[in-house]
Each structure stands twice: as C-alpha cells, then as structure tokens.
Amino acid sequence: MIKQALISVSDKTGIVDFAKSLSDLGVKLLSTGGTAKLLADAGLPVTEVADYTGFPEMLDGRVKTLHPKVHGGILARRDLPEHMQALEQHDIPTIDLLVVNLYPFVATIAKDDCTLADAIENIDIGGPTMLRSAAKNHRDVTVVVDPADYAVVLDEMKANGNAIGYATNFRLATKVFAHTAQYDGAITNYLTSLTDELQHASRSTYPATLNLAFDKVQDLRYGENPHQSAAFYRDLAAPAGALANYRQLQGKELSYNNIADSDAAWECVKTFDAPACVIIKHANPCGVAVGNDPADAYAKAFQTDPTSAFGGIIAFNREVDEAAAQAVAKQFVEVLIAPSFSAAAQQVFAAKQNVRLLEIALGDGHNAFDLKRVGGGLLVQSLDSRNVQPSELRVVTKRQPSAKEMDDLLFAWRVAKYVKSNAIVFCGNGMTLGVGAGQMSRVDSARIASIKAQNAGLTLAGSAVASDAFFPFRDGLDVVVAAGATCVIQPGGSMRDDEVIAAADEHGIAMVLTGVRHFRH
C-alpha cells in the first residue's frame, strides 16, 4: 500500500494534478527544490526532503536526496524482518512511491551555445540513483519516470485501496532501467564526441562510443523470409515526417518487407514539390511520376512498369482523394502511404480490408545517421541528403540541354538517387520511362532500363537519362543513346570522362555533370 511518495521532477507536466490526487488518497508527499515549491504554491501539504532528512541541500543542489533516510526508505525489503527492524531503529519511514524524471541533458546539449560546463551541470546524479534504487526494489516500491503513467497509477490505486500490483510495478521498473540506460548513453555519446576539453568544446560527428536507443513498436510475423524472426523498433527521437510515425488506418499487420519498402517509397516521394506518386518493389522504384493531382501522378507512374507494380508499395505526397483511390484499387497493392486519405478514399478501400493504409504527416526531418550492420560491427554514415541545384550543374558537351531537357534531367537525377546501384533511369515529361537497377555492370542496367520501357510500350525518343555514378566506359552511353535518349546527367569523375564526353558529342546529345555520386546498396 502506498502511504508516502517522494516527488522530484524536471518535467512538471501534470505533476500538480497527480500530487493532488495522491494527497486526496491520503498519501504523504515529500519533494525537493522547485517541485516542492510548485506543490506548496498549489496549496498541497508537502514536506521538503531537507526537512525530512534533517540535512540541508548543499553544493548548489548537487546533494539533495543522497541520504540514508531517502534510500533506506526506498531500498528496504518489506518482507525481510531485519530490513524493517533497521528502518525502525533509525526512524526511517518507507517511501512507497517514487516520481522522478531527470535533468534535461539531451535538450541542453542540443543547444548551439552549449558549453561543456553546461552539459556537466545537467548530468543528474540524485535522480538516477533514486530511480535505480526504486526499480531494483520494485516488489515493494512503485516508480514513475513518465508522466504518461500518472493516470495508470492513480486508477490502480483507486481500484485497490492505494495498492499497486506486481505486474504494474515490474513494467514501470523496466521502463526506468531503459530510461536511465538511454540517459547514460546520451552522456557517453556526448562526452566521447568531444575533441578537446575547452569550455566551448567542439564535437565530432562520430563519438568514440556509440549508444543507440530504440523502443519496440511491435513483433513482426517474420523477417525478410518466413524462417527469420523480426521486430520493428522506433527511434526515441524519430524526426518529423519519418515512416516510424505512421498511423495505420486499416489493413493487415505490416511485415518486415512492407516496412522496409514503405520507407523507400516515402523517402522518395517526400522529395517532390508537385503532386507525386512513387511505386516501390523490393526497395526499388518501378514507377515515379509527378502530375496535376494524385490520380494523374499514379496513372503516369503505373505506366512505367505495370508488371512490377503488382503487389507493390505506393506512396503519395498529397491527400489521396476518391479518384486516386479508385485508380489504385483496380490493382493488387500491399501498402498505400499518404499524408492523409479523404473520407471517400477510405470508403473505396473499405471493400479491400487487406490493403494497408498508412497515414504519415509530411515533414522534412531525417535520421541523424544511416546505419548498416556488418559482421561484428556497424557502419555509420551521414545521410545521402545532398540535393544538386541547377546552378551547380556543369554542361560538358557542345550541345546545351533545352529547358525541357533540363527539367527531365533533374527529375531523373532525383529518382536515380533512390534506385539500387548500378542505376540507370530513363525519364520524360515528369515520369519514369524505364528503370535499370542493381546490376553489377552499368551497361547491363542501361540495357534493362531500355527493355523495361519497350515492354511497357513507352517510347524513349527524346528521353533524359540519369546514371547514379559515372560511366566507366562509353558502352553504357552508346546503349542509352541507341534507345533514344538525347541528354544524360551523371556525376563524372571517371578516368575515361574525356572518352565518354567525346562519345556524347559524337552522338550530338547533351551531357551534364553533377559532381555528386548517389551509390545505393
């Protein structure tokens, strides 16, 4: 039974109402510093920890709760007579509920003007110590680190005569250990990223020790293949507009491959300003287009490769309306992603309950790092977020691209970034015409992209081509020109650039260099 609570919080969200409810249930309140003042100002009967222990706060508040009367009351096992006798001998009441959250270390170091001294002062000592004590003794002590749990605790207390069951205490304790581990991980990441010991310490992008924190969203039916197990975890600091922030409106449970492909589709479609549609199959775009509206964009994207679009993942950067929904509903689709779905669109898909509808608010946030596991290690890199501006492009051929060709080239370049290397993408009039992906030789990607367009009945005459990396030989260029391309965009940087540029001049096409490579593996 909870008779006494100690409350000390930095995040004061909902704390006054929570404390008032505890007081109304007859719980004695202990508190520290600013929290105690807040509760007292609200008219609640609260005892300062300094008065409770008979020992004042000291060292600018660094020592407040580090006292046997606090930790003895938390750590004592109620089922051990010798523990309870020790409390009685030293006049230490039990503390049955601990409500603590920590100094805002992560928010502090996120500030541009944060100094090492600022960071050090925001490393909480007493808070984690109390939290770990209470979590260790969770059989007898309820510990709350998240304001979202206030209502849960109150409801259970009211239903059980101020008592909290073991299942709830265990869940809350595991939450505490996860929280303190993440907190210490953030401190380690910060301190090991410092490149000097000056007050205004510069920071390395990559700390000497890297701690990552994710919360499990759900277990998945299986992994990439049915014999593999899997789960989906969410970054605690998932950026705005990230896939992990999805809300599923209908459909079957998401699979591992659904989530991976949905991320590829969503990241690509977000880069367009005009209404756009991206169709993904096995993490590769098989159709991308912009249009007057979502239905128009979908119709154009679907034309690129109707065969591969079967059972694909489709993403829009505009609300899906009834017209777009009716067009998409004619095909077999695994997942449909958009910022929103109109009521009429949702009604269309109500007849297809297996289709997964994911709603994600648009946002320009990105993951801090791109991660890839290797045997016994982890590769960490910055995101490939480099967007080439038209002013940065360098025309290296005798012929300049026309204004229309330049638009097509920029569109093709944007798409090529999301195609697995080696990537060759034919485009024209705001849509993909042929996509060659994932081949070991660039010339084979060029051939496949051309064949794909032929199979779809699309002409490549006057098309633009993007290559995610340089042409190592002229053979790939010869293939795309033979297919009908009149302009090419590529990074350049090959030992044979001069030979490739000469071939472009020989064919009378325009070639533009970006100076940026977009390998994707």
Swiss-Prot record:
Lineage of producing organism: Bacteria, Pseudomonadati, Pseudomonadota, Betaproteobacteria, Burkholderiales
Catalytic activity: (6R)-10-formyltetrahydrofolate + 5-amino-1-(5-phospho-beta-D-ribosyl)imidazole-4-carboxamide = 5-formamido-1-(5-phospho-D-ribosyl)imidazole-4-carboxamide + (6S)-5,6,7,8-tetrahydrofolate; IMP + H2O = 5-formamido-1-(5-phospho-D-ribosyl)imidazole-4-carboxamide
Annotated EC: 2.1.2.3, 3.5.4.10
Protein name per its UniProtKB record: Bifunctional purine biosynthesis protein PurH
Statement: the UniProt record of this protein carries the keyword Cell division: no
Pathway(s) this gene product operates in, as recorded in its UniProt entry: Purine metabolism; IMP biosynthesis via de novo pathway; 5-formamido-1-(5-phospho-D-ribosyl)imidazole-4-carboxamide from 5-amino-1-(5-phospho-D-ribosyl)imidazole-4-carboxamide (10-formyl THF route): step 1/1; Purine metabolism; IMP biosynthesis via de novo pathway; IMP from 5-formamido-1-(5-phospho-D-ribosyl)imidazole-4-carboxamide: step 1/1
Native source species: Burkholderia vietnamiensis (strain G4 / LMG 22486) (Burkholderia cepacia (strain R1808))
Domain MGS-like stretches: 1-145
Entries under Gene3D superfamilies matching the protein: 3.40.140.20, Methylglyoxal synthase-like domain (3.40.50.1380)
UniProt keyword list: Hydrolase, Multifunctional enzyme, Purine biosynthesis, Transferase
Recorded family membership: Belongs to the PurH family.
